[in-house]
């Protein structure tokens, strides 16, 4: 998925699905899909099992970064599963830096599927580069957890080195190493060569400098399933799994939880990643009838499954749209929320 607000609404997943819908329908599975305030969110549920770890100082990244620190055993957030009145409450805002003084950005004033005022979010998923450590700290003071959105399978030239706080931008480092492949359809981004050691080093620097150093609790790794795309590099599913495991191990060594993103039409991919992954974020799995394909191993393991549905897909009134998927999500142990594809702060949660 490309970052919302960069020229196209929604996600890269939707475009992929529409092209392959007939194949998935033939398999009787439907099609898959591809991103201090006025309302203080309540403290997270005890089921989340979080043990705090201190922020890690950033280290400067050179064009050819040095060896990564050796992973060590550290505590990280283990978000519990979902269900009626259980589990974290989710806000996903990637359109712009989170404004903790904005009721919309903070997810306040939402109405749930039952037509009642929804409780405030306890988990915020925000852009790891655009948002400063002070925003993460402000959310922590409210008792909330914060997920760091980064791209691990593609790169866009969105940020300057100065905005990233490093001498040479991550995009420029990847370009200099020859690790940029074909364009991501519909977005100003290029796939990266996930089999290159230089790519791993740059992405690990991003995890360390943007997520760990700013005090985030977890990482949302976008485009973590590029084996299914035409990237310009030969990549097998097994190689993609190994890449994702390498990154999750590194994140854990820094005290960060790690999520799975995408891969919604490949249950084998989800099954392979679940043992080293702490939560799952799907997009449009209810709309495309693919939730069970990917969520089953996470639900069985008691891990959090988040389903982001989009008003652009369902096209009706919010209450009617929630009524079409929330009951199924909740009964399956999935935490569903309806967003606009711009991911600009509006949210309508199932519970």
Question: Positions of the model-derived regions?
Answer:
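C-terminal motif of bacterial Sec signal peptides marking the signal peptidase cleavage site
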Residues: 25-28
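Glycan-processing catalytic domains of CAZymes
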Residues: 56, 64-351
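Positively charged, low-complexity intrinsically disordered regions
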Residues: 4, 13-14, 35, 49, ...
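N-terminal hydrophobic targeting segments that direct proteins to the cell envelope
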Residues: 35-44
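Extracellular mucin-like PTS domains
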Residues: 44-64
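Extracellular/mature segments of secreted proteins
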Residues: 4, 37-38, 333-337
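Bacterial signal peptide processing site
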Residues: 30-33
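N-terminal export and membrane-targeting signals
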Residues: 1-21
